[in-house]
């Protein structure tokens, strides 16, 4: 059970934890309030180590993703403090698929997404993803002859209804391979990695993209799952134009790189 911020503030005042509502901000910064507490934040504040004027240990070296991919995460959440060490994909002589950009997109026009209960889905988007993989999967497998097939492609989407929709289309289009392609929400891929990650945005151009912009950490995880290529499948017009937002920065990074 989660305590709402308004109740959390009231309890802190009546319990004498804070004397004024202005002091509540201090609890939020230190991670001590019950509505949005963070054990990690409290631990970091107690740590004797400090880097980039932040308390706690910060692992600044990054080797998983090509630099073009991790640059998005670096700008989004790390304030430019990450040190990309893998190098640029376009400069790598061992790059598997040279004609593809490290960050790219496939435009799929849609005004609105569909609703299923409290979730969302976009059937056309799911169909296009399955169709693209049907046409490209053998090519991808041949480009990575020493890699296990299950480690090649992952598909991330913000909505569980879209997960089911994509899985159904994969079963229909590539029945012999669909179960070797991971499909799930960001949480499914926590700690995982794939050579290629596809993001199914789901939103239509008139929907906005609330879920994508709601939590920068989720987009950080989604993008950084991709070792070699990160592709956005959806209507790019649903993404914002402001670079300070997660979707706006993503739009900037993939713009002009249509696959």
Regions inferred by a protein language model and the residue ranges of each:
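Conserved helicase motor core of SF1/SF2 NTP-dependent helicases
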Residues: 1-259
């Amino acid at each position: 059970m989660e305590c709402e911020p308004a109740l959390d503030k009231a309890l802190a005042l009546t319990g004498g934890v804070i004397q004024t509502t202005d002091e509540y901000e201090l609890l939020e910064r230190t991670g001590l309030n019950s509505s949005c507490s963070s054990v990690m934040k409290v631990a970091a504040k107690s740590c004797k180590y400090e880097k980039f004027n932040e308390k706690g240990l910060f692992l600044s070296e990054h080797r998983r993703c090509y630099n073009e991919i991790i640059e998005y995460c670096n700008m989004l959440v790390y304030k430019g403090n990450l040190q990309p060490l893998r190098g640029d994909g376009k400069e790598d002589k061992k790059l598997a698929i040279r004609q593809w950009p490290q960050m790219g997109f496939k435009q799929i026009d849609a005004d609105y997404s569909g609703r299923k209960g409290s979730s969302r889905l976009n059937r056309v988007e799911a169909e296009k993803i399955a169709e693209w993989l049907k046409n490209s999967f053998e090519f991808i497998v041949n480009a990575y002859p020493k890699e296990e097939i299950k480690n090649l492609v992952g598909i991330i989407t913000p909505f569980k209804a879209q997960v089911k929709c994509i899985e159904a289309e994969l079963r229909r289009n590539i029945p012999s391979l669909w179960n070797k392609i991971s499909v799930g929400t960001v949480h499914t891929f926590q700690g995982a990695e794939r050579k290629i990650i596809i993001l199914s945005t789901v939103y239509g151009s008139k929907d906005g993209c609330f879920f994508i912009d709601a939590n920068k950490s989720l987009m950080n995880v989604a993008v950084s799952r991709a070792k070699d290529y990160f592709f956005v499948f959806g209507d790019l017009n649903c993404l914002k134009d402001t670079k300070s937002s997660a979707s706006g920065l993503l739009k900037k990074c993939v713009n002009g790189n249509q696959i």
